[in-house]
């Protein structure tokens, strides 16, 4: 079926849960995309921290095509070689001793919360069901995970919500300690809030949560869906802090654009899960696993991870230079190649407008709420692409400073 597609078709045919850009990308290479009209964009959005190696990376294409020529899917009644290799790679690279594969970050977090409840019920009784999460967090869109995420705008239309979930202020250990007690089964936290404003945790905060969980026999869950797989300059952000969780969720960059998620667990935690307690049709399929295995092989090297840290310094240096010219941002923060620019009060609420102006100038950026412009470029983005993209971003900032959009 040959059909001429326009952006207007989205508004005609798709459920209106997104408001996509007015252009349609049709081709990508590295950190560059081209739309239907042939206009080039430097991609600093990265599919929302997904495209770890940019677009159409040759090694990932080769891994996908090689597996696609063999077989695609069997279901969870059978295992496959790519998923077992990937599991061993993750175990060797992290604290984990067991892995559960799924299709997304939301599914990984759903599995983590279910495991935590079962662990507590089996070991301590059904009274131990409380989950402590944090305001402005984001853990996914299932009913359980959207309830754990501390953003009522995403959950208020779906009441009644799952009970026994309470929220503390992020980076406020005293507030968390008032909620964590012997009825708590788990604490779920992002080492750096992504959707909540690109806000890194303090080391003292995460260390304190670890101590509180140990004291009250609660599991500590790190949601590393956005921060994982090299994004911060370590394979996983927990490695920056020297704080090891009981469970860790990962997705987004793990497949480099091919859908895959995973829950990493210690043997002690994983042992409560038995045949039939949880599952997924597509999780750990050979296509996704082959791509993720190749991506992990490329990313988990000193050269790549050190390169992310170096790129961070160059990126932030250029952003600071832009801010010296236009004064739009009160703070530039983040780790590695997850960077947020917080708007000055004068420009409050204009993050979306800035992202739209950036696209007009030929660079794709993200927002993290109404007041933070977010960057999540490919981990292998070149110096030339950074320079070109931020020159274009500077044009957008100049237009905003001048008082509007063009």
Curated annotation (Swiss-Prot):
It comes from the Bacteria. It holds the Pfam family Aminotran_3. Keywords: Aminotransferase, Arginine metabolism, Pyridoxal phosphate, Transferase. CDD domains: OAT_like. PROSITE patterns: AA_TRANSFER_CLASS_3. It catalyses: N(2)-succinyl-L-ornithine + 2-oxoglutarate = N-succinyl-L-glutamate 5-semialdehyde + L-glutamate. The modification N6-(pyridoxal phosphate)lysine is found at residue 252. Its EC number is 2.6.1.81. One of its GO terms (biological process) is arginine catabolic process to glutamate. Signal peptide: none annotated. Gene3D superfamilies: Aspartate Aminotransferase, domain 1, Type I PLP-dependent aspartate aminotransferase-like (Major domain). Pathway: Amino-acid degradation; L-arginine degradation via AST pathway; L-glutamate and succinate from L-arginine: step 3/5. Its cofactor is pyridoxal 5'-phosphate. It is an enzyme of class 2 (transferase). GO terms for molecular function: identical protein binding; pyridoxal phosphate binding; succinylornithine transaminase activity. HAMAP family: ArgD_aminotrans_3, AstC_aminotrans_3. Belongs to the class-III pyridoxal-phosphate-dependent aminotransferase family. AstC subfamily. Catalyzes the transamination of N(2)-succinylornithine and alpha-ketoglutarate into N(2)-succinylglutamate semialdehyde and glutamate. Can also act as an acetylornithine aminotransferase. This is Succinylornithine transaminase. The gene is astC.
């Amino acid at each position: 079926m040959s059909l001429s597609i326009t952006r207007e078709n989205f508004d005609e045919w798709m459920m209106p849960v997104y408001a996509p850009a007015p252009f349609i990308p049709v081709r990508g290479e590295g950190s560059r995309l081209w739309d239907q009209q042939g206009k080039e964009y430097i991609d600093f959005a990265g599919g929302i921290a997904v495209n770890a190696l940019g677009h159409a990376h040759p090694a990932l294409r080769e891994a996908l095509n090689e597996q696609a020529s063999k077989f695609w899917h069997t279901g969870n009644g059978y295992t496959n070689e790519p998923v077992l290799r990937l599991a061993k790679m993750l175990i060797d690279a992290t604290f984990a001793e067991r892995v559960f594969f799924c299709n997304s970050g939301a599914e990984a977090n759903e599995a983590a919360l279910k495991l935590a409840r079962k662990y507590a019920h089996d070991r301590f009784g059904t009274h131990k069901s409380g989950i402590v999460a944090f305001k402005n967090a984001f853990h996914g869109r299932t009913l359980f995970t959207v309830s754990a995420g501390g953003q009522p705008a995403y959950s208020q239309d779906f009441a009644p919500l799952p009970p026994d979930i309470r929220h503390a202020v992020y980076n406020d250990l005293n507030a968390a300690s008032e909620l964590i007690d012997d009825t708590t089964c788990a604490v779920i936290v992002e080492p750096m809030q992504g959707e909540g404003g690109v806000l890194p945790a303090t080391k003292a905060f995460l260390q304190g949560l670890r101590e509180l969980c140990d004291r009250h026999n609660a599991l500590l869950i790190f949601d590393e869906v956005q921060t994982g797989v090299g994004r911060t300059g370590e394979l996983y952000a927990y490695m920056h802090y020297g704080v090891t969780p009981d469970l860790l969720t990962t997705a987004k960059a793990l497949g480099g654009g091919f859908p895959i998620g995973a829950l990493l667990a210690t043997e002690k935690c994983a042992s409560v899960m038995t045949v039939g307690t949880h599952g997924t049709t597509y999780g750990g399929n050979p296509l996704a696993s082959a791509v993720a295995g190749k991506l992990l092989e490329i990313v988990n090297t000193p050269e790549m991870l050190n390169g992310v840290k170096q790129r961070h310094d160059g990126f932030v240096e250029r952003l600071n230079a832009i801010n010296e010219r236009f004064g739009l941002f009160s703070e530039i923060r983040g780790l590695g190649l997850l960077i947020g620019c917080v708007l000055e009060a004068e420009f409050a609420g204009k993050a979306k407008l800035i992202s739209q102006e950036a696209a007009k100038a030929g660079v794709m950026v993200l927002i993290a709420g109404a007041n933070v412009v977010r960057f999540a470029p490919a981990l292998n983005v070149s110096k030339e692409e950074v320079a070109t993209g931020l020159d274009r971003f500077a044009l957008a900032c100049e237009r905003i400073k001048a008082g509007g959009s063009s």
